């Protein structure tokens, strides 16, 4: 069977599914902010509440995810062209960590957001992969990585 986008490796489907997973998580975190706005009476366009710290934690979990999303997606999509399984694994680790990060933050104790700190491993893996792909694309590196 021919892949829908022929110039991409067939395994790039894993990367595409990881992008869908990231979209799902980001939307879910946004829905949680919307629910918290109603519960804690924080009207638009206010980003934060002066009285409700728990709302601020819920909002911050979503905002931080949005801040990192563009860099994450660029790394995921670029590395995925050369190493789709590696990129998807790193991506799933990172995206899953965003749930743990958010749920820790939702307790109202910002230190508990560190429950999702393992996501740094996935993000760092993508950053190193992007550097490697860039160097290899320039023909400056004959080093082989087994992924």
Predicted regions and their residues:
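Helical transmembrane-bundle signal
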Residues: 19-29, 98, 123-133
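Core segments of transmembrane alpha-helices
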Residues: 63-76
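Long, highly hydrophobic alpha-helical transmembrane signal-anchor segments
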Residues: 1-23, 137, 147
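Transmembrane alpha-helical segments that form the membrane-embedded catalytic/substrate-channel core
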Residues: 23-38, 95-104
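Short alpha-helical packing/oligomerization segments
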Residues: 76-96
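Interfacial loop-to-transmembrane junctions
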Residues: 100-125
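Juxtamembrane boundary at the C-terminal end of a transmembrane helix
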Residues: 131-147
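Cytosolic, membrane-interface loops and tails of multi-pass inner-membrane proteins
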Residues: 31-59
């Amino acid at each position: 069977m021919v892949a829908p986008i022929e110039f991409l490796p067939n395994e790039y489907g894993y990367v595409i599914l990881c992008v869908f997973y990231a979209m799902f998580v980001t939307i879910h975190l946004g829905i949680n902010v919307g629910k918290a706005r109603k519960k804690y009476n924080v009207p638009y366009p206010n980003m934060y509440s002066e009285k409700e710290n728990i709302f601020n934690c819920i909002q911050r979990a979503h905002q931080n995810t949005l801040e990192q999303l563009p860099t994450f997606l660029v790394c995921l999509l670029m590395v995925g062209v050369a190493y789709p399984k590696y990129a998807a694994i790193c991506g799933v680790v990172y995206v899953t960590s965003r749930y743990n990060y958010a749920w820790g933050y939702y307790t109202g104790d910002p230190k508990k957001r560190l429950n999702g700190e393992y996501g740094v491993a996935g993000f760092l893996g993508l950053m190193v992969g992007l550097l490697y792909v860039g160097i290899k694309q320039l023909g400056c590196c004959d080093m082989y990585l087994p992924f």
